């Protein structure tokens, strides 16, 4: 009805028509059209000749002037199965009409009934789409959370391993201390006649001790 | 492969095509039948040879199998138990948990960075001490 009155195209124009509005010159001269404002809470807007209401994402069958075959509160799967079986029964009835009385007006009525059944089935299936979108989003968030937990656990494991390596290296240090003592003994025997170097003998041990103290402080 | 809703809608559309094709093909390949008590005296119209296949049986099988597929796909759809409120609360809970795990991950990364700084400082001290020892040894040799 509205399509015949206003002659609205059912598809958008090709992208070149929109791209041409946004050349650099148009943007510089502020001629590029701005995006439309978002619709208000209960505003009804028209998109390609179809009226849309912001409240419901999917238009109900009543608002499309289509007869509703299912009750208001229903189990979707049972109603879909009923519609499927009704399709078969109506098809068999149509074949009977074609065999017995092909020219009767009931044939066209039967065809309209079958079309109505198909429309109702598709509407019920399309009502699952918002649920499907939310479920997909939930699955994505679950995967994100699992990835984060696994990454944190792996990082923690590497952290513990690094700490173990550092502690192992630290526990291996006293062996160097013993070697240093024996080295110190050698130095003492070598420079024993020269008393002037007695002060210098303490320097390597002092430096080594300072290194050990700094290492212990850093690790703890 | 598409999701189950798209599969189901495609199967419903396929069933509609089966309905149209069944009537069209059967009508196209049907044989003329004689009227009762109305036979011509002259020579009979030659009856064309019957078709090799039974199209009625073929389309009946196709339509029945398609209807069974539709039933199976309908059975695989989710129940009404997962309603909108349940989904929304689940999404909010998942968002909170995601933020919590993000904070945990940041804390672990910060610990790792602290340990890295400590190790770098330790290595720096070790290198400095080694340099000092080398200088001291050179002095002793001189």
UniProtKB/Swiss-Prot annotation, chain A:
GO terms for cellular component: core mediator complex; mediator complex. Pfam families: Med7. One of its GO terms (biological process) is regulation of transcription by RNA polymerase II. InterPro entries: Med7/Med21-like, Mediatior_Med7, Mediatior_Med7_sf. PANTHER family: MEDIATOR OF RNA POLYMERASE II TRANSCRIPTION SUBUNIT 7. Component of the Mediator complex, a coactivator involved in the regulated transcription of nearly all RNA polymerase II-dependent genes. Mediator functions as a bridge to convey information from gene-specific regulatory proteins to the basal RNA polymerase II transcription machinery. Mediator is recruited to promoters by direct interactions with regulatory proteins and serves as a scaffold for the assembly of a functional preinitiation complex with RNA polymerase II and the general transcription factors. Required for activated transcription of the MtnA, MtnB and MtnD genes. Component of the Mediator complex. Interacts with MED21. This is Mediator of RNA polymerase II transcription subunit 7. The lineage of its organism: Eukaryota, Metazoa, Ecdysozoa, Arthropoda, Hexapoda. The gene is MED7.
From Swiss-Prot, chain B:
Its main location: nucleus. It is found in: Nucleus. It comes from the Eukaryota. GO terms for cellular component: mediator complex; nucleus. Residues 87-111 form a coiled coil. Keywords: Activator, Coiled coil, Nucleus, Transcription, Transcription regulation. GO terms for molecular function: transcription coregulator activity. Pfam families: Med21. One of its GO terms (biological process) is positive regulation of DNA-templated transcription. The keyword Magnesium does not apply. Component of the Mediator complex, a coactivator involved in the regulated transcription of nearly all RNA polymerase II-dependent genes. Mediator functions as a bridge to convey information from gene-specific regulatory proteins to the basal RNA polymerase II transcription machinery. Mediator is recruited to promoters by direct interactions with regulatory proteins and serves as a scaffold for the assembly of a functional preinitiation complex with RNA polymerase II and the general transcription factors. Required for activated transcription of the MtnA, MtnB and MtnD genes. Component of the Mediator complex, which includes at least MED4, MED6, MED14, MED17, MED18, MED20, MED21, MED23, MED24, MED27, MED30 and MED31. Also interacts with MED7 and MED10. This is Mediator of RNA polymerase II transcription subunit 21.
């Amino acid at each position: 009805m509205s399509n015949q009155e206003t002659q609205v195209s059912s598809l958008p124009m090709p992208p070149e028509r929109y791209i041409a509005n946004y050349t650099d010159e148009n943007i510089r001269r502020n001629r590029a059209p701005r995006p439309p404002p978002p619709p208000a809470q209960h505003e009804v807007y028209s998109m390609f000749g179809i009226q849309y209401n912001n409240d419901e994402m999917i238009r109900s069958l009543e608002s499309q002037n289509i007869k509703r075959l299912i009750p208001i509160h229903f189990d979707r799967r049972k109603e879909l199965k009923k519609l499927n079986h009704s399709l078969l029964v109506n098809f068999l009835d149509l074949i009977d009409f074609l065999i017995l009385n092909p020219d009767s007006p009931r044939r066209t009525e039967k065809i309209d009934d079958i079309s109505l059944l198909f429309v109702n089935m598709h509407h019920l299936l399309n009502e699952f789409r918002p649920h499907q979108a939310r479920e997909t989003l939930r699955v994505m968030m679950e995967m994100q959370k699992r990835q984060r937990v696994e990454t944190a656990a792996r990082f923690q494991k590497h952290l513990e391993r690094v700490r173990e390596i550092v502690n192992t290296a630290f526990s291996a240090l006293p062996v160097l201390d013993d070697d240093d003592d024996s080295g110190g003994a050698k130095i003492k025997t070598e420079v024993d006649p020269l008393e002037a170097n007695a002060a210098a003998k303490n320097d390597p041990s002092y430096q080594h001790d300072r290194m050990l103290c700094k290492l212990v402080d850093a690790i703890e | 492969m598409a999701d189950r809703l798209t599969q189901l809608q495609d199967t419903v559309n396929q069933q509609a095509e089966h309905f149209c094709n069944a009537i069209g093909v059967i009508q196209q390949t049907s044989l003329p039948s004689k009227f009762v008590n109305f036979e011509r005296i002259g020579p009979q119209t030659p009856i064309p040879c019957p078709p090799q296949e039974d199209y009625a049986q073929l389309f009946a099988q196709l339509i029945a199998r398609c209807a069974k597929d539709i039933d199976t796909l309908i059975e695989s759809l989710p129940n009404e138990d997962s309603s909108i409120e349940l989904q929304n609360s689940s999404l909010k809970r998942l968002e909170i948990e995601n933020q919590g795990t993000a904070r945990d991950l940041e804390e672990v990364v910060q610990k790792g960075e602290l340990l890295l700084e400590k190790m770098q400082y330790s290595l720096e001290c070790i290198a400095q001490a080694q340099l000092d020892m080398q200088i001291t040894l050179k002095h002793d040799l001189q």
